[in-house]
Design a protein with these regions (language model features):
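Leu/Val/Ala/Ile-rich N-terminal alpha-helices, chiefly Sec-type signal peptides and the beginnings
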Residues: 1-156, 160, 167
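Aromatic-residue detector
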Residues: 70-72, 76, 165, 172-174, ...
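Alpha-helical scaffold segments that mediate packing/assembly in large oligomeric complexes
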Residues: 157, 161-185
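Long amphipathic all-alpha helical oligomerization modules
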Residues: 174, 178-301
Length: 301
């Protein structure tokens, strides 16, 4: 038995698994342990089916492999849209059109001033159209992320229920192992059994215990993946909300400036400052996003 199963390794797995299912109360009764022992003794070659019938597994419909990749590129889409928004805002700066707010240019070179003003209005119209599309794209991304979060929440619930069932089963196997490995069998059943027979039963219990622990550890890893994905998506939602708010602010500025005339040229002073503030805000958002993205790489299984 010890040549095929490393008992020390199993003990380590048990310690890890117990920590994972710490929330599962050990309420396995002595009668449950006795019932399992009797079944294994009476039908030693049917241990696989005995264990299978005892497992109280909740169906854990983990669609990780099928779905996680469809959400893995959301971060790249968010970053791409933020950069597009940043470019839109930067293109609105009057400084790119020989400073429309420059009174000297307006007074001494009115034709150049009017030409620059026309160019600015043309750019503003184009940017306004781009902002409308960007806002639509951001909203669509929010819908995708919301769907992703629903998927994550469902899987977290499934895994939690799955671990609860596995935790109860784990406690049963641990107690059965304790009985068989510490000469307590006589407290439950007829002890006049060949030692080799008892060792074979112990082997089957240890093998099942090892599998149970490995599954619990694997499910715990899945939970960490889901939590990571959820945290990442929440961060994306924050970035998208900020981006949409900035887009709406600039969009409103463009609406206000669509009827620009000489009397209202001073408004460009405020627009320039607000635009630069928006540029800085978006730049900071992109920088923060990249830092988070580096800390939380896309997870695959």
């Amino acid at each position: 038995m010890e040549q095929n199963l490393d008992v020390n390794n199993i003990r380590q797995l048990v310690d890890i698994a117990i920590k994972v299912v710490y929330f599962v109360e050990d309420n396995v009764s002595e009668s449950e342990v006795k019932d399992l022992l009797i079944k294994l003794i009476n039908s030693p070659f049917d241990s696989y089916f005995i264990f299978k019938s005892l497992k109280k597994d909740v169906k854990c419909d983990l669609l990780l492999n099928n779905n996680i990749q469809s959400y893995a590129d959301i971060g790249d889409k968010v970053e791409k849209n933020l950069q597009s928004l940043n470019s839109c805002i930067q293109s609105l700066s009057p400084n790119k059109f020989n400073n429309l707010k420059d009174g000297f240019l307006q007074k001494n070179f009115p034709s150049i001033f009017d030409s620059n003003k026309t160019k600015y209005k043309e750019v503003a119209t184009k940017v306004r159209e781009e902002l409308s599309q960007l806002e639509f794209d951001f909203i669509r991304l929010k819908i995708d992320i919301s769907k992703s979060n629903q998927f994550v929440d469902k899987n977290l619930t499934n895994v939690q229920n799955y671990l609860k069932a596995k935790g109860l089963y784990l406690h049963l196997l641990i107690k059965t192992w304790d009985v068989l490995s510490n000469n307590k069998l006589s407290q439950y059943v007829d002890s006049n059994l060949p030692q080799e027979f008892v060792e074979n039963i112990l082997y089957s219990v240890l093998d099942e215990l090892k599998t149970c622990c490995e599954i619990i550890v694997s499910m715990h890893t899945s939970m960490k993946i889901y939590h990571q994905l959820r945290t990442r998506n929440d961060y994306f939602l924050k970035n998208i909300d900020n981006a949409i708010n900035n887009a709406k602010t600039v969009f409103q500025q463009l609406k206000d400036m669509s009827s620009i005339n000489d009397e209202k040229i001073a408004i460009l002073n405020n627009l320039t400052q607000e635009t630069n503030d928006s540029i800085q805000k978006i730049s900071d958002e992109i920088k923060d996003f990249k830092q988070i993205k580096e800390q939380q790489p896309v997870v695959t299984e």
